[in-house]
């Protein structure tokens, strides 16, 4: 079976999509964003296609495309629809698959289901993206507890931002989790800069061959 990985995060806007693009490029993976909230600006699928330099065949269509950039449950309500998680089936691919959640781990899909609940059903190894800034210890440890309470397999934590050695070490130790690496913030972000930075700061063997 090919690698299948979930990319989730401690919060929205922390860099999951940029990390996902780097990971897709490194693995030659297919990308899938099940729920896209907000269509006026460049979507996450479009960002990944550009930064990963991925062909259209490697960017799968979203299961739900919602107009308002908000939590999926609210965005769906404003569009007059309800997200039905039971209808979201993991696509079969011949290549590795990277699945990116929307917002943070506990973002609601509807009035009953959180993204974490869907991940618990899928049981695919998940990468938790976390800031390296002040406050991230609490956010990251809480997210890890939420994942483990649902038996979501945790591959490790990917930090995003400026280096904070003590914070990263503390999270790895207290969270009993693998520290996968840290993706620094990049000025004038380009595909080439992103690919080079990922290769310097992560070990591809930590991601390759992971399957459930």
Swiss-Prot record:
The UniProt family comment states: Belongs to the dethiobiotin synthetase family.
The organism's lineage is: Bacteria, Pseudomonadati, Pseudomonadota, Alphaproteobacteria, Hyphomicrobiales
- Please name the GO terms that the record assigns under molecular function: ATP binding; dethiobiotin synthase activity; magnesium ion binding
| CDD domains listed in its UniProt record | DTBS (cd03109)
Record's catalysed reaction(s) = (7R,8S)-7,8-diammoniononanoate + CO2 + ATP = (4R,5S)-dethiobiotin + ADP + phosphate + 3 H(+)
Residues bound to substrate: 37
Descriptive protein name: ATP-dependent dethiobiotin synthetase BioD
Task: Name the residues that bind ATP.
Answer: 13-18, 100-103, 184-186
Q: Name one GO cellular component term.
A: cytosol
Record's subcellular location? Cytoplasm
Q: Which residues bind Mg(2+)?
A: 17, 100
Query: Gene of origin?
Result: bioD
Q: Please give the cofactor(s) recorded in the UniProt entry for this protein.
A: Mg(2+)
Recorded hits in Pfam families, A to Z, give: AAA_26
Q: Which residues form the active site?
A: 33
Family annotation (SUPFAM superfamilies): P-loop containing nucleoside triphosphate hydrolases (SSF52540)
Enzyme Commission number(s) from the entry: 6.3.3.3
Does ATP-binding show up as a keyword for this record? yes
């Amino acid at each position: 079976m090919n690698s299948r990985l979930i990319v989730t995060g401690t919060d929205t806007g922390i860099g999951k999509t940029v990390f996902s693009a780097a990971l897709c490029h490194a693995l030659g993976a297919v990308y899938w964003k099940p729920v896209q909230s907000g269509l006026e600006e460049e979507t996450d699928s479009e960002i990944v296609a550009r930064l990963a330099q991925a062909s259209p065949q490697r960017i799968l269509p979203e299961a739900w495309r919602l107009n308002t950039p908000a939590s999926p449950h609210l965005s769906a309500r404003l569009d007059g629809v309800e997200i039905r998680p039971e209808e979201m089936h993991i696509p079969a691919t011949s290549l590795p698959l990277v699945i990116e959640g929307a917002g943070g781990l506990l973002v609601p899909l509807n009035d009953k289901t959180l993204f974490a609940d869907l991940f618990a059903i899928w049981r695919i190894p998940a990468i938790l993206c976390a800031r390296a800034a002040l406050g991230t210890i609490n956010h990251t440890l809480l997210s890890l507890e939420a994942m483990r309470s649902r038996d979501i397999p945790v591959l490790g934590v990917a930090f995003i931002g400026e280096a904070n050695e003590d914070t990263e070490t503390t999270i790895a130790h207290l969270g009993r989790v693998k520290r996968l690496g840290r993706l620094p913030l990049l000025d004038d972000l380009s595909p080439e800069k992103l690919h080079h930075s990922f290769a310097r700061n992560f070990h591809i063997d930590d991601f390759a061959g992971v399957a459930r």
